[in-house]
Amino acid sequence: KELLDKAHSMDMHILLDLVPGHTSDTHPWFQEAKKAKKSEFSDRYIFTNCVWEAPSEYRLMCGICERDGNYLVNYFSSQPALNYGFYNVTHPQWQLAHDSDGAKATAEALKDVMRHWLDFGVDGFRVDMADSLVKNDDEKIATSAIWKDVRNMMDKNYPEAALVATLKEPSKTAASIWTFTLTTPETATHVFSDFLKTARI
């Protein structure tokens, strides 16, 4: 809080690094999700329906949870993927649709995290891999819908807050994920040009 107050007193803004695609495997949500007993966190991450189900097209950590299933990771074994659902469901035994209750609950949890930090005083977020939330979403249709909902929430309650995206496929997704303050060289030019008009350098 002291850092925020000092930065704001100097007309500076602070953006937090937001990683919405996964958590640590030590996160309390995941500690509950990997238990055999069902809970509100059982669908927060992507688990197969049994330990023998391990499709080769996904990065899965196998046979290490109390729960009968393997969990999907985004990159490393310590990064269980949060479950925003699948746009194209190919394994209905364990994949949730992007508009299912479980997937929607994850998107709401993301907004809760953002609201917490915006209420604390941060000025926005740099969003890591913003176009990789919903799985099997090649055209980023469902992922874009999540960010449009987030942007609507921010415009209503935090209109000065910024979202800066990093994208896995910027040439493919920058046009569709239009809710970010910065996504392309063109938007960056406009934002920084506006800043330079009033900045004290």
Give, region by region, the residue ranges found by the protein language model:
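Alpha-amylase-like alpha-glycosidases and glucanotransferases acting on alpha-linked glucans and related
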Residues: 25-132, 145-201
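Conserved beta-strand->loop/alpha-helix structural units within folded catalytic cores of enzymes
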Residues: 3-19, 117, 122
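Aromatic-lined carbohydrate-binding/catalytic grooves of carbohydrate-active enzymes
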Residues: 1-2, 12, 18-28, 129-144
